[in-house]
Amino acid sequence: MASSEQEILAGLAEIVNEETGLPTDSVQLDKSFTDDLDIDSLSMMTIVTQAEDKFSVTIPDDEVKNLVTVGDAVTYIAGAQA
């Protein structure tokens, strides 16, 4: 079953919180993973792997570089679930 964008955002916020300790309310659609949330490439790969498991999607390694903002990730996951 496909998740709504709000459900995906909430799920990603939980994953980011678990990985980085950032408050879930700081994970917003317009936030950059690297510039705003200070997530490095290793943490990003962990977040991607957890998101794949949580949302039952596959995010190819070469697609991860295109997930600049939280909104990019939400849009990608929503599209992959459709």
UniProtKB/Swiss-Prot annotation:
Query: What's an example of a GO molecular-function annotation for this chain?
Result: acyl binding
Where is this chain's protein located in or outside the cell?
Answer: Cytoplasm
Q: What keywords sit in the KW lines?
A: Cytoplasm, Fatty acid biosynthesis, Fatty acid metabolism, Lipid biosynthesis, Lipid metabolism, Phosphopantetheine, Phosphoprotein
Superkingdom, natural source? Bacteria
Q: In which pathway does it act?
A: Lipid metabolism; fatty acid biosynthesis
**SUPFAM superfamilies, from UniProt?**
ACP-like
**One Pfam family named in its UniProt record:** PP-binding
Q: Which Gene3D superfamilies match?
A: ACP-like
GO terms for biological process, alphabetical = lipid A biosynthetic process
Q: PTM O-(pantetheine 4'-phosphoryl)serine: at which residues?
A: 41
InterPro entries in the record? ACP, ACP-like_sf, PP-bd_ACP
Q: Post-translational modification, briefly?
A: 4'-phosphopantetheine is transferred from CoA to a specific serine of apo-ACP by AcpS. This modification is essential for activity because fatty acids are bound in thioester linkage to the sulfhydryl of the prosthetic group.
Q: Assign the protein's first listed, main location to one coarse class.
A: cytoplasm
- Which cellular component appears as one GO term in the record? cytosol
**Which residues are in the Carrier domain?**
3-81
Give the record's family classification: Belongs to the acyl carrier protein (ACP) family.
Q: What task does this protein carry out?
A: Carrier of the growing fatty acid chain in fatty acid biosynthesis.
| Protein known as | Acyl carrier protein
Q: Which gene encodes it?
A: acpP
